[in-house]
């Protein structure tokens, strides 16, 4: 549902329309209720009509739940720009150990750099990077003390003239999955990269 809510906020183009299919006969009522909250238009009786329950911000707020960190994760704290290069090397060493592909390793280093740089620039403090394996993915997590006020940052294409949100946009483009939690106590972003299936660790 979070993905559905974000799409409508990102693709605000009257010339673009998509049709999402839901089996109203068999799906639970709560799933159908969320579908009405995350879709501005509903197809009923052969025609489209506005959804009176449309409330994507409410759904995003409900999906904004704390994310668990693996207690066995390896960590690296970035306190300034001088720590970025060592952080990339740290990420590369762990990626090689768990079997991430060469292309995936390059993506991981870029993701770790962009997440840490974003924390340094906008959170006003250090960034704690953590890495661990989750099933067939490598997770790169960034935690800081800042608060992400715009949930669409990183999903909208950044302005050609500006640099704000460009890093998070790249993270979302390179990772297989990005999860975010933000509150007054700080922000956590987790980026998932698929491991090389040819190697079993």
Residue ranges and their predicted role:
Residues 66-68, 117-201:
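Conserved beta-strand-loop-beta-strand hairpin that lines the nucleotide-binding pocket
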Residues 7, 91, 115, 142:
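Aromatic/hydrophobic pocket-lining residues that form π-stacking "cages" and hydrophobic walls in ligand
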Residues 76-80, 157-160:
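HAMP-domain connector/hinge
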Residues 1-73, 85, 101-103:
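Non-catalytic regulatory/interaction regions at protein termini and inter-domain linkers
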Residues 81, 85, 89-113, 162:
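Conserved short strand/loop->alpha-helix "switch" segment adjacent to the catalytic nucleotide/phosphoryl-transfer site
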Residues 3, 112, 164-167:
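Amphipathic coiled-coil/heptad-repeat helices and related helical stalk/stem segments
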